[in-house]
């Protein structure tokens, strides 16, 4: 009899404690909305950049932050230019507009280049991690603007994109380095979101 009572004890204890509740599952982490904020008229932050070592060894215009804000390239060459970053052989800079632009009829982005008319390739993405969509491949970027500044316009729909926040500009000249200059590759001055108003924003020299 005593042995039977001992066998019943665990069952009585379990019943008194009630059913075991499963541990609650952790709430999923919300994915940030890249389009929650309004875009700036000009790129406002550098996401990443890469310039090949053989170009860095002789280029003197290597600061990717020079591609931020309104176009402001100026000065005289070869050693006294200001306001741009030389991308070097196949180099690139990826910029953040601060919010999403949506495709509209006609061009959506204006790429400002300095001094020459070297071609550029342009990619866009909604995520800093990509994937990046090619929207222009090696487009000549030499439209006259002012002073030493040149430009070319890009329609993101050319690559099938409908929205974009991050813009990657890549050298399309592809002249092997070292090339014997201090400003190898395309010289990136600024990236503009054409549908965003620029009222009150200063564009030096325009």
How would you label these PLM feature ranges?
Residues 1-9:
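Bacterial N-terminal signal peptides that target proteins for export
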Residues 23-31:
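Ser/Thr-rich, Proline-interspersed low-complexity disordered segments
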Residues 202-206:
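Short, solvent-exposed mixed-charge patches
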Residues 14-16:
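C-terminal motif of bacterial Sec signal peptides marking the signal peptidase cleavage site
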Residues 18-20:
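Bacterial signal peptide processing site
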Residues 30-200:
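A domain-level signal for the mature, folded cores of soluble proteins
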């Amino acid at each position: 009899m005593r042995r039977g009572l001992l066998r019943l004890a665990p069952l009585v204890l379990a019943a008194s404690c009630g059913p075991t509740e499963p541990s609650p599952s952790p709430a999923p982490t919300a994915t940030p909305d890249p389009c929650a904020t309004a875009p700036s008229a000009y790129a406002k932050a550098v996401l990443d950049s890469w310039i090949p070592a053989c170009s860095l060894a002789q280029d003197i215009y290597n600061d990717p932050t020079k591609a931020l804000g309104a176009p402001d390239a100026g000065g005289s060459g070869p050693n006294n230019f200001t306001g741009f970053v030389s991308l070097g052989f196949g180099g690139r800079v990826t910029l953040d507009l601060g919010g999403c632009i949506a495709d509209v009829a006609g061009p959506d982005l204006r790429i400002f280049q300095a001094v020459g008319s070297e071609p550029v390739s342009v990619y866009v993405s909604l995520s800093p991690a990509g994937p990046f969509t090619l929207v222009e491949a090696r487009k000549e970027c030499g439209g006259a603007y002012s002073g030493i500044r040149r430009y070319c316009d890009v329609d993101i729909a050319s690559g099938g994109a409908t929205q974009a926040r991050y813009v990657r500009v890549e050298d399309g000249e592809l002249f092997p380095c070292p090339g014997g200059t201090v400003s190898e590759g395309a010289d990136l001055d600024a990236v503009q979101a054409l549908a965003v108003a620029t009222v009150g924003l200063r564009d030096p020299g325009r």
